[in-house]
Amino acid sequence: MIIERIRLRNFLSHSDSDIYFDTGINMIIGQNGAGKSSIVDAIRFALFSDKRTRRTEDMIKKGERYMEVELYFRSEGHSYRIRRTIERRGKSISTDAEIERDGSIITRGASDVSNYVEKNVLNINKDVFLTSIFVRQGEMDALVSKDPAERKKILDEILNIDRLEAGYLLLKEVIDDLTANVSDYDYLKNELQSKINEIDNNNKQIEELESKLRLIEPEIKALEEEINIKENKKDHLNEELHRLNAQLETIKKYEMELAESQSRKASIEMEVVKLPSIEEELKRLENNAAVVKRNEIIEYINLKKDLGSLSEIIEGLKSDLSKYDEAHRKLEDLQSFRSEFLEKKKRKEDLDKLRSSLKEDEDNYQSAVRNIENIKKWIENEEKEIERMSAFISEILKIQEITPEIINSRRAEINSSLMQIEGKIASLNASIDAMRSHKMEVEENAAMLSGRGVCPVCGTHLGTEKSEDLVKHYGEEASRLEEDINKTENEIKKLDEERKHQKKLLDRINGKDVERLIASYNLLSSKRAELKKFMDDEARLKEAHLKAEAAISQYNSIDLGDLEAKNEEWLKANAVISSIDIENIRSRFEEKNKQLNDIIKRMNEIEVNIPDVESYNENSLKRIDEELNSLRNKKNELYAKKAAMDEIQKTIEHFKEEISKKKGIEDSQAEVNAQLLQINDDLKQLSSRLDKINVDQYEWKSLHKVLLQDNEKLNIAVADIRKRLEKKETIIKAIADLKRVREAFSKDGVPAIIRKSASEFITNQTRQYIQRFELDIDDVDVDQDFNITVFRGGIAEGIDSLSGGERMAVAFALRVAIAQFLNKDVSLLVMDEPTAFLDEDRRSDLANIIEYSLKDSSGIPQVIMISHHRELLSASDLALEVKKRNGSSIVDVIR
């Protein structure tokens, strides 16, 4: 993996830093707090979303809402770009990420990108990668300066052996928890056997009950069949008894109907004896003249009615003829008045049409006249009010001329001025924050240096004079910053006063008085346009107005008073004539007179034939008809009763024959009842026996069901216990496996293997690097407990026997060897403050070691170092310097 470029926007102290790296030694130097380590933090953040801050949003530069990091690197022939962002959105935080390979997006999302980097790009565990390529501050010195126990602890942490030992302790807790979980294993086995024994006992009882139930089934079946036979016979006897009872009921009915029929026959015989007298009276009435000459009498009555109706019609026709003659004379007398009326009415209607056609224009004209007068008055009043308000507002705003355009222009100027002031204040506040932050860093550094003479970051001895110069420099820098802060705060106060003044002016311009004035101007302009429209309408409609006035004058001069009354009389006379069809009336008058004469002639003929015809009327004829019909109906009724009496006699004979069978039916009924009594006794005995057997069967079946249900529950319990036992057995097996795994995690297990492998590899790699350094050391050995032994002239010596430079060389070789052990293909090494706690000579030695061992070497293609000491610049291929300017970190290429 080779890092080519990293871009930081609003990341920690970096506003916008775009940093390019190269192969070889990349040195990043700068004062404490300049933002050097932020670059390393950004690399870790881009790769794995790692952060050193407590909260994610704390990585966003103070005063900003958005942060972005872009990392460009090469790995295994591919070019990659990772982009991560954090954004404040109100109270929430939004994060995003994406990874691009050879120009194509591979995946998005913070966790997905991290997983892809670990599994598809680096192909090693994140922790192993970070441990192998990132050398922490003071880590190299600790490898040779600490005592053996502490050195072993440091190496265990680097190689993750400490995690195996922690796993060894954790596995004991897990095993103890699992052992407690299987403490009831024997109890469950005993409980299982108890349940199985209970099921076996239940099964024995079930077999006995099933045997009893099988034996009792044939007896129940035989009893049920015998009962069914008896029940069927009982049903047949009941049917026969029902039939006999029905026959007896029918005979009882016949006995009652016989008495009734005999009574009816006697009653009819008493009525039939009246038949001869009724026939004689009917014959006498049928020979009466009112019956024999009935049609002529009815004709005479109808002609008499028609005679009266014709007389009324003829009188009406005479009246219509008289009305017609009188109306005709009146029409001739009024004709001249009628003609004069129509002529004047036509003239008046024409004038009215003209007036109606001009009505809309006349109404519009009158409306325009009224509106002109009203608007002129309104404009006059509004101009006075605008003049008054303009004088008042002009005095307040200090503007000579007041118009809506001038007011809006002034408002825009004030808003623009306010925005500029707000921007300046925000910028100055940000500058104050940056200066205060810088001042705090300077004061902290001065406080840490004062009286100690040691660099607070790396522990370098500065000497009294250099320390005092640096403290003095920090004091001067703090004073200058305080002075700049005060000046900036005064500038902010002036800007704030101006802002208040401009806001006051804006409030006045946005006030109700100004708004009313603008509204009045706009309304006045609208009213003036409206006035012009109405004045144009008045001029356009003037001619129509004059025509309308002339038409109204002529219309009012025409008087139809007397002529209208004469015309009404003419219309009434004409209506009478129009309503009378004179020719039809004259024709009908002649026709009705002829009909009248014909009726009188026919009535005279009937009176000659029937002298007493006048004595008859409709009521007398009706009475005769009613009497005649009554006699005829009685005659027919008596003949019908005589025929019915013969039928009744036949029915009486039939009833007597059926009643004679009653004795035989009653004997059969008694015999059937006796048989039913015997069958009921038999059924009672059989049912009693069956009920007793059924009770036994029900009790056995109930017990059988209870035992089956009990077995079902027991089987469920057995299955549950077996499952629990299987789980327990799995756990017991797991405990045994975990014990074996824990044994592997013990100090004599995997950790010992790793230490052995690591010690061999680290010894070989360290030996190779030591040989390059051309030191007075023949060999070096690192044992499994990470004790370091060096050899001079074949004599073994401890690490403490080495000079400062030699110790630094061994420490550097060890750390590079460890990195290569963790990651065989390590192509990048990032060292954060490797000079920490080193004196000037040892820093110089480290520079030489780096130059001889890493520069232009194919072992580790790229090294990135962070330091605030410039002694290492000589060993670099690319040098970058980080400085703080106005609270932001700036990165410059210096070599």
From Swiss-Prot:
GO terms for biological process: double-strand break repair. Zn(2+) binds at residues 455, 458. Keywords: ATP-binding, Coiled coil, DNA damage, DNA repair, Hydrolase, Metal-binding, Nucleotide-binding, Zinc. It comes from the Archaea. Residues 411-507 form the Zinc-hook domain. Transmembrane segments: none annotated. Disulfide bonds: none annotated. InterPro entries: P-loop_NTPase, Rad50_ATPase_archaeal, RecF/RecN/SMC_N, Zn_hook_RAD50. The keyword Nucleotide-binding applies. Its cofactor is Zn(2+). GO terms for molecular function: ATP binding; ATP hydrolysis activity; zinc ion binding. Binds 1 zinc ion per homodimer. Residues 183-253, 464-510, 618-647 form a coiled coil. ATP binds at residues 32-38, 137. Part of the Rad50/Mre11 complex, which is involved in the early steps of DNA double-strand break (DSB) repair. The complex may facilitate opening of the processed DNA ends to aid in the recruitment of HerA and NurA. Rad50 controls the balance between DNA end bridging and DNA resection via ATP-dependent structural rearrangements of the Rad50/Mre11 complex. Belongs to the SMC family. RAD50 subfamily. Homodimer. Forms a heterotetramer composed of two Mre11 subunits and two Rad50 subunits. NCBIfam families: PRK01156.1. The two conserved Cys that bind zinc constitute the zinc-hook, which separates the large intramolecular coiled coil regions. The 2 Cys residues coordinate one molecule of zinc with the help of the 2 Cys residues of the zinc-hook of another Rad50 molecule, thereby forming a V-shaped homodimer. This is DNA double-strand break repair Rad50 ATPase. The gene is rad50.
